[in-house]
Amino acid sequence: MDVVAFFTEILKFRSITPDDDGCLKFIAEFLGDFEARFIEKNGVKNLILSKRFGDGAHLAFAGHVDVVPPGEGWQSEPFTPLMKDGFIYARGAQDMKSGVAAFVCACRDAKNFNGRLTLILTSDEEGDALFGTLEALKILKERGELPQFAVVAEPTCTGVFGDTIKVGRRGSINGKILIRGVQGHVAYPEKCVNPVHQIAPLLSRIAGHDMDAGSEFFSPSKIVITDIRGGMEVCNVTPSELGIMFNVRNSDITSADDVKNYLQSVLEGLNFELSLKQSSKPFLTDKDSKIVRAMSKAVQKISGVAPQLNTKGGTSDARYLAEFGVKVVEFGVINDRIHAVDERAGVKEVERLYLVFKELIENFA
């Protein structure tokens, strides 16, 4: 079974997060000469596949088989792959069964590799992502089997296949500000403490504020306000409190404590509460590391495109690998239809992705 046929088969599994619908078992049977360990926790299924070829480097591939719900309006049944005009349409085609198919087949077919290959597969990435890759990594650490290097096959390319390798990701800090005032009649503003009036002159110092100037691989860590509300939707009563919700996609330059200290200085003198939660931490893999150099070389050889290295986008399971000290990069197909109606992946992209991963493995000395 070639990579396109295998890709088509795994697209048929209705693996809406966190249900793998039997997809992981199918993959384990496909790679029958790899040692398989199934891990299940809180209704989440994970699979670790491993094979030692020699005493060289330990390289891992990671991905998820779960997908988001398809929604309505598709031109075909979302879990019945449709091949049309050089594309395969199905939910999960780009995000990320194309990547899974490519590295599974590459691990099966690669020759002359002298290290250890591990595949980490989960059905919990599109949901809470608490009992998936993270749980598998805990077990690998307990067994002393953490990989040195890893590739997460998320769809990274934006315009043409081969244009982007992700070498890191920004972190995510969610925050809430509650400003307390004194409710009163609008005719007697001197008797009120109006939190709307208090925050108004300060908003320009919060909304869109860059916590840092950015760096070679990270854009500035910006405070983005997502919600402001207060009052009772009436015109004659001032509010007793006002709430603000915000997010900061932070680089490795700015920490949650930096955000806390800045906002406390801006809000000094007000009666306020501030809460922050770092839901994911930023990471950056050195551009001169072995995995970055090897991936860049493989991508350029197969695609003919010199890939750019960046950290744009949201979070992914690569953050967990980085937290465990694994040098990790991300590379996959074009991502223009992820989570969309009529999600699709180019047949030639999938074939070339397979060749990129095979090239990487065979030359990862």
UniProtKB/Swiss-Prot annotation:
Which residues are the active-site ones? Answer: 66, 125
Superkingdom as given in the UniProt entry: Bacteria
User: According to its UniProt record, which reaction does this protein catalyse?
Assistant: N-succinyl-(2S,6S)-2,6-diaminopimelate + H2O = (2S,6S)-2,6-diaminopimelate + succinate
- Recorded GO MF terms: acetylornithine deacetylase activity; metal ion binding; succinyl-diaminopimelate desuccinylase activity
The protein's matches in SUPFAM superfamilies, at most eight in alphabetical order, are given as: Bacterial exopeptidase dimerisation domain, Zn-dependent exopeptidases
The cofactors it requires, by name, are: Zn(2+); Co(2+)
Q: Does the keyword Metal-binding apply?
A: yes
| Keyword terms, alphabetized | Amino-acid biosynthesis, Cobalt, Diaminopimelate biosynthesis, Hydrolase, Lysine biosynthesis, Metal-binding, Zinc
What detail does the entry give on cofactor binding?
Binds 2 Zn(2+) or Co(2+) ions per subunit.
Which Gene3D superfamilies does UniProt cross-reference here? 1.10.150.900, 3.30.70.360, Zn peptidases (3.40.630.10)
Binding positions (Zn(2+) 1): 64, 95, 154
Query: What residues does Zn(2+) 2 bind to?
Result: 95, 126, 339
Give, as in the UniProt entry, the pathway in which the protein acts. Answer: Amino-acid biosynthesis; L-lysine biosynthesis via DAP pathway; LL-2,6-diaminopimelate from (S)-tetrahydrodipicolinate (succinylase route): step 3/3
What are its GO biological-process terms? Answer: diaminopimelate biosynthetic process; L-arginine biosynthetic process; lysine biosynthetic process via diaminopimelate
E.C. number(s) listed in UniProt: 3.5.1.18
Q: What class of enzyme is it?
A: hydrolase
Q: Which InterPro entries match?
A: ArgE/DapE_CS, Bact_exopeptidase_dim_dom, DapE_proteobac, Peptidase_M20, Peptidase_M20_dimer, Peptidase_M20A
* Listed PANTHER family: ACETYLORNITHINE DEACETYLASE (PTHR43808), N-ACETYL-L-CITRULLINE DEACETYLASE (PTHR43808:SF31)
Q: How does the annotation summarize its subunit structure?
A: Homodimer.
Its biological purpose is as follows: Catalyzes the hydrolysis of N-succinyl-L,L-diaminopimelic acid (SDAP), forming succinate and LL-2,6-diaminopimelate (DAP), an intermediate involved in the bacterial biosynthesis of lysine and meso-diaminopimelic acid, an essential component of bacterial cell walls.
The record's family statement is: Belongs to the peptidase M20A family. DapE subfamily.
Q: What is this protein called?
A: Succinyl-diaminopimelate desuccinylase
Identify the species of origin: Campylobacter curvus (strain 525.92)
